[in-house]
């Protein structure tokens, strides 16, 4: 039996038991959002071998970032629930608590602050993965006043109706443009090319299925996992798996 604890549960306990007591009297927001498999709840025991551990993202007013960061880092225990509170991240060591200002963090991840409004260009320029990172995860505390962290997330929960229809139309067009190609490649004896295009089409259909169900498609490593967790997706997943595993272009079609 695995004793793996999902990162979102670990971080929730870390905030409540360790971080929050260090912030008495400090207005702040706290969450586990942004990059990381645990934010989308796709982490496993394997995830613990890199960039993983008790993590909390703290948001405070800009003028208090340095002060709060120093206070929190000084108060962290060496370990929490058996995990170090300072761990490797892209080859560098850093505390599991990041202290920053909300508006700056949002602009850094998205290119804009959704609390100030989301334009058409904003919607169409942000990758699905970034939208998922901001709207998924969990907010542990939203104490900065309104509009705060939850307001920012709510503004990005899903596309406006007209934008959603445009995004769906674009995705359908991606499928339509290459739909004949597995067969065309096969007709000239290019089984490898047919397989490559077939896999590309499977990826785009997976993304389309998620978009139709109001889910931002994650990047490649988690795309299949996201589809598998979507209710009613088993038949589609089986068909796509058969197409990708096909040994001939006629079977693939």
Describe the residue ranges of each PLM region:
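Glycine- and acidic
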Residues: 1-8, 55, 183, 188-190
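Helical scaffold of the NTase/Pol beta-like nucleotidyltransferase catalytic core
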Residues: 1-32
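Flexible, glycine- and charge-enriched loops at secondary-structure boundaries
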Residues: 8, 12, 65, 168
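A broad, structural surface signal
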Residues: 13, 17, 21, 70, ...
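Active-site nucleotide-donor binding segment shared across nucleotidyl transfer reactions
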Residues: 20-57, 61-63
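Conserved NTP/Mg2+-binding pocket subregion across the NTase superfamily
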Residues: 66-187
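Conserved nucleotidyltransferase catalytic core and NTase-mimicking acidic/glycine-rich helix/loop elements
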Residues: 131-253
